[in-house]
Each structure stands twice: as structure tokens, then as C-alpha cells.
Regions:
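Helix-boundary and loop/linker segments of multi-pass membrane transporters
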Residues: 2-6, 33-37, 77-84, 118-119
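Alpha-helical transmembrane segments of multi-pass membrane proteins
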Residues: 17-28, 58
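Hydrophobic transmembrane alpha-helical segments in integral membrane proteins
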Residues: 1-15
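Loop-to-helix transition at the N-terminal end of transmembrane alpha-helices
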Residues: 8-9, 35-48
Length: 181
């Protein structure tokens, strides 16, 4: 694959995190009650552990899976003959729809909620909350997404764009930024 999707994904993730941390420090919606440095260290540690887990055991095999599915011509998008911008846009819609229903399932299915509630256990929400996930949730989520990749069949670039967008959206949604009325 010509594009360095893995490196690009990391740049988008870290760049978004730093941007929202900076904006939060300038325009906080709520004053901090606890020690922010300690909180950022904790969430950063969770993220570091999860990054190793995800990168080694999930992300690389997953990206290879996306490439394999595309090469085999599997998935609805392949069967419809989608390509170019149309494939990317429709893949974003399809993957986002899956992500929405997966997130709803994490709140409604007791087994999934056991893992997802670690994310909701945060007492003060800020951009670092977007880093707080139970490793079990990451594994289960990746398995669910792998099945959806098989069904839909996005191209690797569509997958990369989706992962970047969902990461930036999650960081924004969790940010402690005072937005104007």
C-alpha cells in the first residue's frame, strides 16, 4: 500500500488531542475540580497501554483484513462497483451507521456495558475522556467492526478517513470547551 495510513492515523489522533487540549485550556466549559495533571497522566497511561494493545494485536491485523477484503472483492460496496469519492462518502455513512448502532448496543447489552461503563466512570469530562476505554471493549469493538468490514467492504482509504473522523469527533464531543450560545 502506497499511503502510510498507520502514520497518518497517529498524526490525526495526536494532532486532534493536542488541539482540543489547547482549546480546553483557553475556553473551559467547567472549572477543574481535581488535579488535571494527574487526570491527564492516568488517561494518558490508559491510552498508552491501549495503543500498544491496539497497534500490535488489533490495528495492523485489522488494516490487513480491510486490504484483504478489498482484494477479494467482498462486500456490498464492491458488489455495487463503488469507487472514488462515492465509495468513500457511502463508506463513511455505512461505517458511521454501524458505529452508532454498536455504541447503542454497548449501552443496552449488559455484557457489553460491563466494558463500556469504564468510559462513563469519568467524573470530569474532557478530551482525555476520549482515551478512556477498557481493553476488552476495544477487542470486542474490533471484532464487530471486522464483521461489518466484511459486509460493507470499504477501501483502506475509506477506512482511514472514517477512523480519523470518528477519532476527531470523539475528541471534540468529550472536550471541556465552552461553546458560544
Amino acid at each position: 500500500m502506497e499511503l502510510d495510513l498507520d502514520g497518518g492515523r497517529l498524526v490525526v489522533f495526536v494532532g486532534g488531542l493536542l488541539l482540543f487540549l489547547f482549546i480546553e485550556s483557553l475556553f473551559p466549559a467547567r472549572n477543574w475540580q481535581g488535579n488535571r495533571a494527574r487526570r491527564l497522566f492516568f488517561h494518558g497511561s490508559v491510552a498508552a497501554f491501549n495503543t500498544v494493545l491496539v497497534r500490535v494485536f488489533i490495528y495492523v491485523p485489522f488494516l490487513l483484513w480491510v486490504v484483504f477484503v478489498e482484494q477479494q472483492g467482498w462486500g456490498i460496496s464492491r458488489w455495487l462497483g463503488l469507487d472514488g469519492w462515492l465509495e468513500i462518502v457511502l463508506s463513511l455513512i455505512a461505517l458511521d451507521a454501524f458505529d452508532y448502532f454498536w455504541h447503542r448496543a454497548n449501552h443496552r447489552v449488559p455484557f457489553l456495558w460491563r466494558f463500556h461503563k469504564a468510559h462513563h466512570a469519568d467524573n470530569e469530562m474532557d478530551v482525555s475522556t476520549a482515551l478512556r476505554f477498557h481493553p476488552g471493549e476495544l477487542v470486542l469493538s474490533s471484532l464487530a467492526k471486522a464483521s461489518w468490514v466484511l459486509v460493507w467492504g470499504p477501501t483502506p482509504i475509506a477506512w482511514f478517513v472514517f477512523e480519523g473522523m470518528i477519532s476527531l469527533c470523539a475528541q471534540f464531543h468529550h472536550s471541556n470547551i465552552d461553546l458560544p450560545d
